[in-house]
């Protein structure tokens, strides 16, 4: 069998196949259909400090060019993840990447500390989430807030930190350089491309949250 192993920010994956954060959940959802030990890593569903119920339905809208989703970071919270999901994930035979989403730099540090203590192999920082100190604008929209989120995550992390960039900016290279300057070990491209589908009969967005 050929050696397909790759080095991701100093962590060896058996192959370059990584289940992206989101619909793969915490791995349990797919283990009846696929041997999770055969992939390089699982990047779990986005985690927040407190549990989140997510956006109201409808959350999914089909378009002629793809599909929009607006789940809204539904998750049980980082403490529940560390208690209930990590013991199971550690037995899956693959590397675990925690995707973290904070509303403040302090929350990014707290999240990084908790998932590191739980035993994840890498951390992915979601800077597309809103910064409550900047009127709700996403951290990844500006270089200074990107740096703040990255530095905070690095301060709490004991494992490599990957910053997941938002495509909804004027110059993604500028944001990437800010993350690198703040100590990011790697970059993940990209998070959701914003879109909207209109229900022509109702003259309203199809998604309850308007965009996805």
Predicted region positions:
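Alpha/beta enzyme core
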Residues: 41, 57, 91, 103-212
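N-terminal capping/small domains of soluble enzymes
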Residues: 1-96, 102
């Amino acid at each position: 069998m050929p050696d397909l192993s790759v080095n991701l920010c100093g962590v060896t994956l058996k192959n370059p196949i990584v289940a992206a954060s989101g619909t793969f959940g915490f791995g349990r959802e797919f283990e009846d259909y696929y041997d999770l030990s055969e992939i390089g890593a699982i990047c779990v569903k986005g985690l927040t400090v407190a549990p989140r119920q997510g956006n109201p339905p409808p959350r999914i809208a089909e378009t002629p060019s793809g599909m929009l989703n607006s789940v809204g970071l539904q998750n049980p919270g980082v403490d529940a993840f560390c208690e209930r999901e990590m013991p199971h994930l550690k037995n899956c035979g693959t590397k675990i990447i925690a995707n973290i989403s904070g509303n403040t730099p302090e929350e990014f540090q707290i999240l990084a500390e908790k998932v590191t203590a739980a035993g994840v192999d890498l951390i992915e920082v979601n800077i597309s989430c809103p910064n409550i100190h900047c009127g709700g604008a996403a951290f990844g929209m500006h270089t200074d807030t990107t740096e703040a989120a990255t530095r905070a995550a690095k301060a709490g992390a004991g494992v490599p930190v990957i910053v997941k960039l938002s495509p909804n900016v004027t110059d993604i290279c500028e944001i990437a350089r800010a993350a690198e300057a703040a100590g990011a070990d790697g970059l993940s491209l990209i998070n959701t491309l914003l879109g909207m589908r209109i229900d022509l009969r109702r003259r309203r967005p199809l998604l309850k949250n308007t965009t996805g």
